[in-house]
Amino acid sequence: MKKLAIVYHSAHGHTEHIATHVLEGARSVPLTQVDLIRAEDLAQDPDRLTPYDGIIMGSPTYLGGVSGTFKTFMDATGRLWRQQALKGKFAAGFTVSSLPSGDKQSTLMSMFVFGMQHGMLWVGNPFLPEQHQGVPVDEAVNRL
């Protein structure tokens, strides 16, 4: 059985809403255990991540980056980095913001760099951008 952690911060419920959809999708994969974990809880005990095979990160985009609470979680993993405890695990991320641009890509890049610092393997999105499927550019979803 593979273990997957969805680590997220949600101040107003929007990121949590997306996290629950990610949870449902991941649980549809046979032989996969998926846990939804708040970033603020992991900041106190980041060692809880070590049994997982993959980590999906979720944060709102605030002023072009992850939320302060999510950054606190990221910073708390310093010891795991020194031990290379997350090396070789899978990583992915998602974000939400209230504006069409809002620099969501910067937030996803922060998660990507965090994963690379830990030696994780980033899992990208296998879908073409929506504008290639006929969706108007102003309605298309930003993807990394």
Language model segments and positions:
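Aromatic-flanked redox-active Cys/Sec active sites in thiol-based oxidoreductases
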Residues: 8-12
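FMN-binding flavodoxin-like domain, especially the glycine-rich phosphate-binding loop
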Residues: 2-4, 14-17, 21-39, 47-59, ...
